[in-house]
Amino acid sequence: MLNIFSLISICLNSALYSSSFFFGKLPEAYAFLNPIVDVMPVIPVFFFLLAFVWQAAVSFR
């Protein structure tokens, strides 16, 4: 159990101190893809919401 907590703390610390990981810039050659890359993290949320819409369509069987 201690190993899990230490792994989580290591991940959180590395995520907090490497802000360039979250706010990295694409190379110049791929700059035209910036709008697509900005939207990509939201795509899994759409699939999650689609599951609820699908279940509502079949009356939550």
From Swiss-Prot:
<keyword id="KW-0150">Chloroplast</keyword>
<protein>
    <recommendedName>
        <fullName>Photosystem II reaction center protein K</fullName>
    </recommendedName>
</protein>
<comment type="function">
    <text>One of the components of the core complex of photosystem II (PSII). PSII is a light-driven water:plastoquinone oxidoreductase that uses light energy to abstract electrons from H(2)O, generating O(2) and a proton gradient subsequently used for ATP formation. It consists of a core antenna complex that captures photons, and an electron transfer chain that converts photonic excitation into a charge separation.</text>
</comment>
<keyword id="KW-0472">Membrane</keyword>
<keyword id="KW-0674">Reaction center</keyword>
<dbReference type="GO" id="GO:0009539">
    <property type="term" value="C:photosystem II reaction center"/>
</dbReference>
<keyword id="KW-0934">Plastid</keyword>
<keyword id="KW-0604">Photosystem II</keyword>
<dbReference type="InterPro" id="IPR003687">
    <property type="entry name" value="PSII_PsbK"/>
</dbReference>
<keyword id="KW-0793">Thylakoid</keyword>
<comment type="similarity">
    <text>Belongs to the PsbK family.</text>
</comment>
<dbReference type="GO" id="GO:0015979">
    <property type="term" value="P:photosynthesis"/>
</dbReference>
<dbReference type="InterPro" id="IPR037270">
    <property type="entry name" value="PSII_PsbK_sf"/>
</dbReference>
<feature type="transmembrane region" description="Helical">
    <location>
        <begin position="40"/>
        <end position="60"/>
    </location>
</feature>
<dbReference type="Pfam" id="PF02533">
    <property type="entry name" value="PsbK"/>
</dbReference>
<feature type="propeptide">
    <location>
        <begin position="1"/>
        <end position="24"/>
    </location>
</feature>
<keyword id="KW-1133">Transmembrane helix</keyword>
<dbReference type="GO" id="GO:0009535">
    <property type="term" value="C:chloroplast thylakoid membrane"/>
</dbReference>
<keyword id="KW-0812">Transmembrane</keyword>
<keyword id="KW-0602">Photosynthesis</keyword>
<comment type="subunit">
    <text>PSII is composed of 1 copy each of membrane proteins PsbA, PsbB, PsbC, PsbD, PsbE, PsbF, PsbH, PsbI, PsbJ, PsbK, PsbL, PsbM, PsbT, PsbX, PsbY, PsbZ, Psb30/Ycf12, at least 3 peripheral proteins of the oxygen-evolving complex and a large number of cofactors. It forms dimeric complexes.</text>
</comment>
